[in-house]
Amino acid sequence: MGNIVRVDFHVHSIGSSDSLSKGEALYRQAKKLGLGKLIITDHNTTKTVFELQKMYPDYVIAGEEILTTKGEILAIFVKEELPKGITPLEAFKRLKDQGAFISLSHPYAYMRHGWTEAEMEEFLPYLDAIEIANARNLLDMNLSAAKFAAEHGLYGTAGSDAHGLRELGAMGLSLPDFNSADELREAVRSAEVFGKESPLTVRYYSRKAVFLKMIHRKLGIRLY
């Protein structure tokens, strides 16, 4: 670790069902924005990020957003893809075995597979952090998540939850540079959130992606 970098910890690519952002385009945009790393956290898949990581191993970090039977887990430095629909405990065990950094996606955002306070308290022993700032959340949700983290001795992650290129970098952390899950665990201790909540209109990117992918499937056309 050393110099301070700005990193968006929650990013979706075309690998997610509700995004059209290609990996190469995300890489170029991240570089343009001056982000220190590119972390891709697609829904229940690591296909795109593993492919991009082979091309840019010193810049791209593999993540995954895993839908469990309770809520979504945001995992960083994953080595093996986890399927959706498993229990949180199964996910935590498998992620711990990989040495991954474990955060919980958008607490209090109950309409988006967020987590309740009771659930977060139940799973505290397995967590490295929770997401305390998500650009697609309402401000009150982010403030509540940050308050919960502070009261329970947890560190926080922050991200744009980008589903379109224009969202990338809307939120994130400024923190010491890191190259492993263990270094990240140390870096988040002195991290600061940057950015602000996105307008509700960004949901357009997700809905457009879902619609276009549905049409392409019906026509038998592959997008990637």
Regions found by a protein language model. Give the residues of each.
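Glycine-rich, histidine-containing beta strand-loop boundary motifs that form or position
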Residues: D42, H106, S160
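Divalent metal-dependent hydrolysis catalytic cores, especially in the metallo-beta-lactamase
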Residues: Y27-N44, A100-S103
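Charged catalytic cores and adjacent phosphate/nucleic-acid-binding surfaces used
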Residues: M1-S17, K22-E24, R28, K47-A62, ...
